[in-house]
């Protein structure tokens, strides 16, 4: 070993010690997770929920678009029909052990029934506990879009209501008037 190599090695050791002392007194970037929550942006894609209309009914019309667009096939549902002609899901099931939280189901939903909330604490030791049914997903409020009502904007007539007496709702669109 030459004197030059010894001096370079000594200076490298001094530089390493100075870097350690510099970082000892700087603020730590690590968050103490359970006690100190992380900031999540408003567009964070977390747990999937099902929302309700303004009147308290289910928004989901069982169109099956969410299940079709899901890349990992974690959504399953079965359509049923009410007496007034509206569709609703007889069962709605999401397997969160397969879900990749891509948000495609939220984008595909025409009724804004499916929404992603900023909940990310879904871990469990048993995989069967990560299969959520409709009762687990359905919340009591309208979620992110409180004023949105699918049937008001789509102009679909409900069997029990007369077209003349739609209170505060748009009349149904006559599709034949739209033809060229």
Swiss-Prot record:
A GO term from the CC aspect: plasma membrane
SUPFAM superfamilies for the chain: 4Fe-4S ferredoxins
Record keywords, A-Z: 4Fe-4S, Cell membrane, Iron, Iron-sulfur, Membrane, Metal-binding, NAD, Quinone, Repeat, Translocase, Ubiquinone
Cofactor: [4Fe-4S] cluster
GO molecular function, a single term: NADH:ubiquinone reductase (non-electrogenic) activity
Domain of life where this protein originates: Bacteria
Domain called 4Fe-4S ferredoxin-type: residue spans: 50-80, 90-119
UniProt remark on cofactor binding: Binds 2 [4Fe-4S] clusters per subunit.
Keyword 4Fe-4S attached: yes
Catalytic activity: a quinone + NADH + 5 H(+)(in) = a quinol + NAD(+) + 4 H(+)(out)
Entry membrane topology: Peripheral membrane protein
EC number(s) per entry: 7.1.1.-
Role played: NDH-1 shuttles electrons from NADH, via FMN and iron-sulfur (Fe-S) centers, to quinones in the respiratory chain. The immediate electron acceptor for the enzyme in this species is believed to be ubiquinone. Couples the redox reaction to proton translocation (for every two electrons transferred, four hydrogen ions are translocated across the cytoplasmic membrane), and thus conserves the redox energy in a proton gradient.
Name of the molecule in the record: NADH-quinone oxidoreductase subunit I
Organism: Buchnera aphidicola subsp. Schizaphis graminum (strain Sg)
């Amino acid at each position: 070993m030459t004197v030059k190599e010894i001096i370079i090695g000594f200076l490298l050791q001094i530089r390493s010690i100075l870097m350690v002392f510099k970082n000892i007194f700087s603020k730590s970037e690590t968050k103490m997770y359970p006690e100190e929550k992380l900031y999540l942006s408003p567009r964070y894609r977390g747990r999937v929920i099902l929302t309700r209309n303004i009147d308290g009914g289910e928004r989901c019309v069982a169109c099956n678009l969410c299940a079709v667009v899901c890349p990992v096939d974690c959504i399953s549902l079965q359509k049923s029909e009410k007496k007034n002609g509206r569709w609703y899901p007889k069962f709605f099931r999401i397997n969160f052990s397969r879900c990749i939280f891509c948000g495609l189901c939220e984008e595909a939903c025409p009724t804004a029934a499916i929404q992603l909330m900023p909940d990310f604490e879904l871990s469990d030791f048993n995989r069967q506990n990560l299969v959520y049914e409709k009762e687990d997903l359905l919340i009591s409020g309208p979620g992110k879009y409180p004023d949105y009502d699918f049937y008001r904007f789509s102009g679909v007539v409900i069997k029990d209501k007369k077209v003349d007496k739609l209170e505060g709702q748009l009349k149904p669109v006559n599709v034949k008037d739209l033809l060229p």
